[in-house]
Regions:
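Terminal amphipathic/targeting segments at protein termini used for secretion
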Residues: 77, 84-94, 126-142
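Extended amphipathic ligand-handling, pore-lining, and cofactor/metal-binding catalytic surfaces
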Residues: 132-202
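Tubular lipid-binding modules of the TULIP superfamily
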Residues: 1-118, 205-206
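An exposed acidic His-Trp-rich patch
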Residues: 110-134
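Extracellular/luminal segments of secreted precursors and ectodomains of membrane proteins
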Residues: 89-99, 105, 113-115, 127-129, ...
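Glycine-rich loops and low-complexity Gly/Arg-rich segments
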Residues: 67-68, 76, 81, 117, ...
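Hydrophobic lipid-interacting interfaces of membrane-associated proteins
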Residues: 46, 60, 95-106, 124-126, ...
Length: 206
């Protein structure tokens, strides 16, 4: 009927969580700024005019989980019955997250000088899928928390002299390490903040 729950009710529900409740819970779990692991890798030499490139990044920080935080991406599904439970789903954009590191690279040219670098990595059009479920009038719980395939924009302050093959290898290793760092936080500590948050806001009726 006219009073049936719609995607707009779901949107309001999710917006209320991501705008206030989730940032507060994430902050209480110390997720304003998260230390992420250091890493190192080698990009192999491809010709006599370049050497193996030795790269290391440390002092990694992940920010953006609390402020500006995650935002709803598109419309949520309308609340609907699945068995005896009401369930709704939504995509949340991860593009406000930001990874930063300092580091160094040696071997981008035959001179083999050591270059100090700073690295900034931002997810682009990347999202998480959240599903919340609740028994009739009961406390909501997190049914699904899924991170979809991540794409990154990678920025390095000091340009390295790399041919296309080596540049691709350099960027793909950074993307791989960035994905591991993000998933490690999003699927454990941040998931706990999400679980706490959905429990505290009443779901819309179907």
């Amino acid at each position: 009927g006219v009073l049936a729950g719609s995607k707009y009710d779901s949107n309001v529900y999710i917006d209320s969580i991501v705008s206030t409740v989730l940032p507060a819970n994430a902050r209480s779990l110390g997720l304003d700024s998260v230390d992420v692991p250091s890493y190192a890798f080698i990009v192999k030499s491809t010709s006599l005019t370049n050497r193996d490139l030795h790269v290391e990044f440390h002092g990694g920080k992940l920010v953006g989980l609390v402020s500006p935080g995650l935002v709803r991406w598109g419309d949520c599904s309308a609340p609907g019955w699945q068995g005896f439970n009401v369930t709704l789903g939504c995509y949340l954009l991860l593009d406000n997250l930001h990874l930063s590191y300092v580091g160094s690279a040696k071997g981008d040219s035959v001179l083999n000088t050591n270059k100090t670098l700073s690295l900034n990595v931002v997810p682009v059009k990347s999202s998480a899928f959240i599903e919340v479920t609740s028994g009739s009038g009961g406390i909501p719980s997190l049914k699904t928390w899924l991170i979809r395939p991540l794409n990154f924009s990678v920025g390095v302050t000091k340009p390295l002299t790399l041919n296309d093959q080596r540049k691709t290898a350099f960027q793909s290793e950074i993307a791989k390490q960035s994905q591991a760092a993000l998933l490690n936080v999003l699927l454990v500590r941040f998931k706990e903040a999400v679980e706490r948050s959905v429990r505290s806001v009443k779901m819309p009726k179907p």
